[in-house]
């Protein structure tokens, strides 16, 4: 069964299958799964048969460290399903751990989050993969609406609220009023794009090759959107692109911020564009209510202050 814009409180299980992380919420228990959206597989034969050997955190630890015949897969890209089979296996694995081996869903109603910018075909794919994993009924919920409900915004009121949902693959800006999305702008850059910017900067400035896990560590440790009172440094280990040998460099937060700035500016422009297209009466509400940031990318140092200064909210 395929439905849209549901009453979220009628559903016992909520699933957010993100590009970077998969989160499962149960009404009676809260968040019960928060794992990386990664699957590790081993090739069995030349016909393409695969054996799944790890999910989530265990699989993420293998990224960049696998021998021949084993690879890590991210089943989602830019907020949508890229590998239907692996997505199904991943959801089934997490739900089996919750409900007991060999059982299907204990609860028939499951709400699954998707970016509001995805197509109807992409929404249907999310529902189909959830049903294939064992759900009796599945509906899709736009991520900005789910985020708004999660933080306690009364979305059914005649009042404008802006939610900026910044995950790993997409950044989505939604103006919400009367239970619906009035304006929606999205750009397929977010946390992963920040990591890629760091990887590119390290290659260009230091001829140093690093992996995505190292880039993420740099972003978390010394990344920022605005200058800091006390700038930070950290030692980064990688492979020298010139001679192929191990190499250690000292990296400053200033360099990282410069690398991240184009991506942050693109997100900022997306928010500005959405606000510019918002009806005047709702803009008045935004001045009073401010803008809500959600998603892992929102944790970048100084990001909320930068957006506040740039957008006068």
Regions found by a protein language model. Name each.
Residues 171:
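Acidic, divalent-metal-coordinating active-site segment for phosphoryl/phosphodiester hydrolysis
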Residues 1-166, 174-291, 298-313:
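Nucleotide/phosphate-binding catalytic cleft detector across ATP-hydrolyzing
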């Amino acid at each position: 069964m395929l439905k849209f814009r549901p009453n979220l409180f009628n559903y016992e299980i909520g699933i957010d299958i993100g590009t970077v992380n998969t989160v499962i919420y149960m009404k009676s228990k809260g968040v019960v799964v928060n794992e990386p959206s990664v699957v590790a597989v081993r090739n069995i034969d030349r016909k393409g048969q695969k054996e799944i050997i790890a999910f989530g955190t265990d699989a993420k630890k293998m990224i960049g460290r696998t021998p021949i015949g084993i690879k890590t897969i991210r089943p989602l890209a830019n907020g949508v399903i890229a590998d239907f089979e692996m997505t199904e296996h991943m959801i089934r694995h997490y739900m089996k751990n919750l409900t007991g081996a060999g059982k299907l869903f204990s609860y028939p109603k499951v709400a699954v989050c998707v970016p509001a910018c995805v197509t109807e075909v992409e929404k249907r794919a999310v529902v189909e993969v959830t049903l294939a994993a064992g759900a009796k009924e599945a509906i899709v919920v736009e991520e900005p609406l789910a985020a708004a409900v999660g933080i306690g915004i009364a979305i059914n009121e005649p009042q404008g609220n802006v939610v900026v949902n910044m995950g790993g693959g997409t950044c989505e800006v939604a103006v919400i009023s009367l239970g619906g999305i009035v304006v929606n702008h999205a750009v397929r850059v977010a946390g992963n794009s920040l990591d890629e910017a760091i990887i590119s900067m390290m290659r260009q400035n230091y001829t140093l090759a690093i992996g995505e896990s190292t880039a993420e560590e740099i972003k978390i440790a010394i990344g920022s959107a605005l200058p800091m009172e006390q700038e930070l440094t950290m030692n980064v280990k990688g492979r020298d692109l010139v001679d192929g040998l191990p190499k250690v460099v000292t990296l400053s937060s200033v360099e990282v911020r410069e690398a991240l700035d184009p991506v942050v500016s693109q997100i900022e422009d997306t928010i500005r564009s959405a606000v510019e297209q918002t009806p005047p009466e709702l803009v008045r509400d935004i001045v009073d209510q401010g803008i809500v940031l959600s998603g892992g990318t929102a944790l970048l140092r100084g990001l909320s202050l930068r957006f506040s200064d740039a957008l006068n909210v």
